[in-house]
Structure formats: C-alpha cells, structure tokens
Amino acid sequence: GLKLFAEIDHSAEAEAAGLKLPPTVVFIFGNPAVGTMLMQANNAVSLELPLRLAVYRDAGLGCTVLSYHAPSSLAHQFALDDHLKVQAIVSKMDALLADICTTVANDQR
C-alpha cells in the first residue's frame, strides 16, 4: 500500500520566515516495494522517489492546481524504457496519480 512519508507546507514555512505564499503543500508518498523495484533497475532513480504531488493555489488561474512528474517520464529519464517490468510498474503509477488527482478534483466540486 501507499505510505505518506511527508507533508511539506511551504506556505506555513514561508509565513514563519516572514514571507507570503499562497497555499502550497507537497505530499511525498509511495509504496516502498514498488519504488525498490525501480531502484533495483537503476539506483539513480532514487533521486526522484518517493513520488511527490504539489497542491497549490494559482492566483492567476484562480484555482487550485495539482502538479506532479509522471512516473513514466522516469523510465525515459533513467534509461529504463527497455525494462518491460518497469514499464508495467510506471504505467500503474501514472494511473494511480491520475486517479488521485481526479478524486481530489471531484471532491472539490
């Protein structure tokens, strides 16, 4: 299952530093077993794991934005495109992140 490793409230930290920042939070999460399989294929991918999801208020757009790097981009970035097992894993990770964002967006309506 998924594990939440950290929640970083950048706007609270900005306020503590005497600065202003619209609501901005980053969630760091993942499944250690899945991440380990990716790192076994190329340990350098550890730089990008666990996954991160940024949630912030964009005043210009007038809405809340959810932003993340697609796990499938990691396969290309770390030369894992030829690993069929990795492709299956990152496809599932892409779908998971899309599902999370869809669920959050639907809950906000």
Stretches found by the model and what they are:
Residues 1-109:
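Feature detects long, helix-prone N-terminal segments enriched in hydrophobes
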